[in-house]
Amino acid sequence: MKRTALALLLLLVPFALFARSRTVRSGPIDTPAAWLGQRALGHESFARLVASSDVVALGDITHATHELHAAKQSLVPRLVAHGFRVIAFEAPYSEYKALDAYVLHGTGDPEAALNLPPYWFWDTNEILDVVQWARAQNAAGLTPPIRIAGIDATSPRVTAAEVVAYLSRVDPAYASEAASIYHCIREGYTGTNRCRTAISTVRPTMLSKRDAYVLASSLDEYEEMLYAARIVEQGERVLVAHRYEKDPPMAENVLRFVSRGQKVILFGHNEHWGRIAYQLEKVESIPSAGSYLAIALGSRYFALGSMVLDGTFLAVQYEPGVRSGSIRTHAMTAPSPDDYGVLFSLAERSSMIVPLRGPLPSWLAGTHRMRFAGSTVPILEVPADFGAKFDGVLYVRTSTPTQLRHWPTF
């Protein structure tokens, strides 16, 4: 029933995405520096502010700014102290199970698990420190324990292989059929209705054989593999539409934790966690994972975005006309006078967290300019309304590159 409700929610959300408007212009109540100074929070105060939330997203304006990763090192322990127990990454579902096994049981090698080239931006000393800290807490007896999850459905072939391996143990006859069904999403798949329909039959078949599968394995393993079959369904759509279908699965996978009573910390890019749709190179808006979460959870979802004024960061650069690329250090482009980084720099602080719920002063309300970069360059500059997009912002004056552990090429 809960899964049905979540699926229905995801179907209904797009009709409501653009109805939300939280920014209210208020008259000038003080100078920008004074207003920002009065609102600015330290990390401990921020953790208390969001303690009653079910999900707190820690968004990144670039995927590889040290100061934002360092903030996670500081914020995660404080959020865990307020009952948050799941650290969910914008990262692949199956591959990140190795990190969960490490923090839960101490098995495996977290350094090897983070060395995943498509998600190179998490393979940093800062994130490794968070993972090792989580393991230390669990080893000391923290109850309930901290879990780590990948919530991205971008590698369904890996997950499909897991499902088939499970079926080979509990139902060898059907395992062969499932393997044949999943074969259609082999390398180079571009999407067919026949494949999509066939893939969607695996999960109902597993449901119909629940008792036998639980008897042959365990309830926990059965439920995990049943959901893995759902990840394959999600991933088939992602393979076809790439990043334009990433967000609904991420939201659905987060809500699965919430439905179990777990409080979640999200790691990922700003644009995925904002409470409204976002734009990339194309004109049309993309419903964000955060927009689905905002409708599902209301004020129990807190989206902390981030911004930087200047400095450097890491991103992949592809040479013109060449399909190969490498990770390089890049400088933020110069901000326009109406850039959010410029507005927040008026506080003359190197870093601060500023809550944005409620009426905003006239100089901050409404639409201004925002620069951001993903895992690749170029840097994009777009209009944005932070009052509608985020519940708060982590401002960093000067960005420096993350402490990357490996430097893959592409």
Where do the PLM segments sit?
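Structured catalytic-domain cores with a bias toward divalent-metal coordination
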Residues: L17-F410
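Positively charged n-region of N-terminal signal peptides that target proteins for export
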Residues: M1-T4
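Hydrophobic h-region of N-terminal signal peptides that target proteins for export
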Residues: L10-L17
